From Swiss-Prot:
Note describing how the cofactor binds: Binds 1 [2Fe-2S] cluster per subunit.
Name assigned to this protein: Chlorosome protein I
Pfam families: Fer2
High-level lineage: Bacteria, Pseudomonadati, Chlorobiota, Chlorobiia, Chlorobiales
Gene of this entry: csmI
Organism: Chlorobaculum tepidum (strain ATCC 49652 / DSM 12025 / NBRC 103806 / TLS) (Chlorobium tepidum)
Keyword Metal-binding among UniProt keywords: yes
Domain called 2Fe-2S ferredoxin-type: residue spans: 1-95
Amino acid sequence: MNLIINDKTASSSVGQTIGKAARLNHAHVGYVCGGHGLCQACYITVQEGADCLAPLTDVEKAFLSPRQIAAGGRIACQATIAKEGTVKVLSRPEEVRRMVFSNPFQLIGYAADMGKDTAQQIVPGVQNLIGRIQRGEMGGKDALGDMIESIQGAAGLVVEAIQQGPMALPIPFKEQIADLISKLPLPQIQLPSISLPQLPSISFPQLPFSLPKLPFSLPFLPQQPQATASLEKVTITVQPPAKD
């Protein structure tokens, strides 16, 4: 069996799931839910050899959208190798990692599509999960063994990636991402200057009549100061009449 995961050859056999083969070969495929198909961290895109895999399981039909299925999407922990041949797949973590280093702008549309697919399959996914819980398919020794195997596979992937160098790590360093973003030709956005319009002056019209003066003062109106009369000193001189 010729299985190629993320452009790397992985040893595998008929009857084995791609997820199990990926764990045993420390391939860059997500390991979270222990093979129950819940997290979709092991989502893969089959690039070649889809006819060598078994048909979609009920779990895949519940959690994968029609768009993902049409694009060759499978869940690695559910996709079983049915016959000999060449199968080439690309995992979601590796696909995202390549986008970060090649064309980060693709991540916007990629994330939007994945979010739409997830929202579209919430109801059938939950129904499938409830059915498996009722049938007792979510526990037992097999589930514990799958979980332990997933942890061991993830640890082996990290150790192997560190030995190969930083570029092989599943998640790029934040320093690398920051350096990449700083080199992107992002356009400078200049905000336009906004000038507020001048408000027109408002003049109240003159009343055609004058209000009568009240004989008393209102308590809420300020008292007008009364003008004080100024006294002027006047000298009167009386002269007696002249004699004839």
